[in-house]
Amino acid sequence: MEEEKKWELEEAPIHGDVLEAVLSRVPLIDLVPASQVSKPWESAVVSSLRHLNPIKPWLIVHTQTTRHPYATTTHAYDPRSDLWVEIEQPPIKHVSVLRSSHSTLLYMQSPFKFAFSFDPLHLMWHLADAPIAWRTDPIVALVGQHIVVAGGVCDFGDDPLPMEIYDLRTGRWETCESLPSILKDSAASTSLSIAVDEQRMYVTEKTSGVTHSFDPSNKTWHGAYNLRPGTNVFSSVIGFLNDRMVVVGLIGDAENAKGVKLWEVRKGTETVDLREMGEMPMKLVEKLKGASPRLRNIAISSMGNLAYLHNPSEPGELILCEVTDGAKCKWGSVRNVVVNEVNRMQTLAFTCSNVGLGDLQAAFSSGDRRFIRC
């Protein structure tokens, strides 16, 4: 009798609040099969993600070798689960160097082809003809149904800064007004920071903070706006957190970075104000520097309320900034598992995505992708 009771206890189903609590500790990649056990389990997974341990934006790090066949690998960090995974997938057809822009866009461009991907896990690649004008190191942005390509280094008639727009609906390129003249001396993407919302592309010159916005629907530039927080900020980048533009600035000078701060951009009818949101703890600033005594640049990948910051010259440490309670900054760091002595010379591209169960289900259903814990 006691053995029967023990057996019944061991086989008792887990349900309700207990099941949701258990599922809140399960990595997101394992919640896909869990949600398919039964309808009650599916409901428990959804409830657990909504109330106990919500999904957080993933950072996805793409690497590409610099020699033929230019193989690519993809790793993703899930902050909800504090877990790195390698995403095994079919090789990406090589067009040129793999690059990323404004957190969500991956692209490759050559004189003949332009390839791009913008879904959360970059499962799908789109191939188009190359822009009319060839240029190296341009700025590239996806705004709504338009891809904008501008700047770079080239010589195109009387217009040194050609600008082209690709319409996703028609599959055609159009030329339009060039970058504002004030940005022409900094037209390469390495000198500019790009951010987008649903209607506009925002371009900031990293040193001066001079910013313009571009609306591809009517091909109109707006600005200039001054987004330099102060004279003690020697380099800054822009992004979006909780649908609000933010500025991340390096304090001091290129030889001696003394700090990193975050500001919210508040735009009025005629002026732009900056409100300080937080300052990175110094121990994280030192991690950001890595082995180098200097911190000359900073890069941002952001989505929702979470920003990932890294040093382009020393990307071994990733700094997390989570905006909570509207405007408070919660700081943390995680080691970039992609960076090691073997692949130190490979090309890195960073994207940030809201990866949900549907995105993971699509990846699993393809049959040729696997998620492997690192």
Describe the function of each predicted region.
Residues V32-R50, Y77:
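Short helix-loop-helix/strand-helix junction enriched in hydrophobic and basic residues
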Residues G259-C374:
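C-terminal closing repeat unit and adjoining cap/tail of repeat-based domains
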Residues N53-D82:
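An edge-strand/N-cap motif at the start of beta-rich repeat modules
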Residues L9-I14, L28, S48, I87-V95, ...:
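Short loop/turn motifs that recur once per blade in beta-propeller domains
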Residues M1-G16, A21, R369-C374:
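CRL adaptor-proximal regions
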Residues A71, I87-K261, C329:
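A sequence/structural signal of beta-propeller blade repeats
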Residues R25, L31-V37, V148-V149, M201-V203, ...:
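Hydrophobic, repeat-rich solenoid/adaptor surfaces of innate immune receptors and signaling proteins
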Residues W7-H15, P27-A34, F156-D159:
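Amphipathic alpha-helical protein-protein interaction segments
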